[in-house]
Amino acid sequence: MNKVSLLHEGKAKKVFLTDNSDLVIQEFKDDATAFNAKKKGSIQNKGVVNNAISCTLFTFLGENGIPTHYVEQLSDRDMLCKHLDIIKVEVVVRNVAAGSLVRRYGFKEGFVLETPIIELYLKDDDLDDPLMNESHAVALGLASYEELDRLKELAAAINTLLRSFFADRKLNLVDFKLEFGRHNGTILLGDEISPDTCRFWDLDSGEKMDKDRFRFDMGGVEDAYSEVQRRVLEL
């Protein structure tokens, strides 16, 4: 499968059209951004690590009944995917209070939520990806109420699967972001699942093992990403 032309370049990936109109190639970059690209940098080998993690997790989810855009891993940085009509709604699932949840509502960081919180955000960098509800999404023409119910249903199922998967690897899935798209009338999970899109804390030590290490200049970013990769791929 060959890259024909660049369809889109985002903060962490390039998406290429292929000679099959139904398929695209995602190329993972080493570029790193935080705070909606207000902070920029690079994490050595990040693209390779995130591609390997994402391919493994998409395979796992697909084997457990979650429809995804993943087709196959083409190389250390390239993933073959189904061509989606992206729904401009980011779905965030929170199991433990961290990040903006702490800032907005006054939770203590690390507070374990009795029930996971599912949030919707408008996918728009210029507006800083604002929090929104279903009525906003429908009014903006992004999705129907039925589609939004499906997004939340899938997000909850994915959370159940991934929490167990990561707990087996001594990682606490604190929260994570999902993106979805339409493909031939079906909603599929898209984008990636990696330390760029998830908060991971070591279950024993509580050490942060995700992009927060880049956001807040904690150091050890490459080591944390590589350790997550090692644990994801080890079993």
Curated annotation (Swiss-Prot):
Disulfide bonds: none annotated. Pathway: Purine metabolism; IMP biosynthesis via de novo pathway; 5-amino-1-(5-phospho-D-ribosyl)imidazole-4-carboxamide from 5-amino-1-(5-phospho-D-ribosyl)imidazole-4-carboxylate: step 1/2. Its EC number is 6.3.2.6. GO terms for molecular function: ATP binding; phosphoribosylaminoimidazolesuccinocarboxamide synthase activity. Keywords: ATP-binding, Ligase, Nucleotide-binding, Purine biosynthesis. PROSITE patterns: SAICAR_SYNTHETASE_1 (PS01057), SAICAR_SYNTHETASE_2 (PS01058). It holds the Pfam family SAICAR_synt. It catalyses: 5-amino-1-(5-phospho-D-ribosyl)imidazole-4-carboxylate + L-aspartate + ATP = (2S)-2-[5-amino-1-(5-phospho-beta-D-ribosyl)imidazole-4-carboxamido]succinate + ADP + phosphate + 2 H(+). GO terms for biological process: 'de novo' IMP biosynthetic process; cobalamin biosynthetic process. It is an enzyme of class 6 (ligase). Belongs to the SAICAR synthetase family. This is Phosphoribosylaminoimidazole-succinocarboxamide synthase.
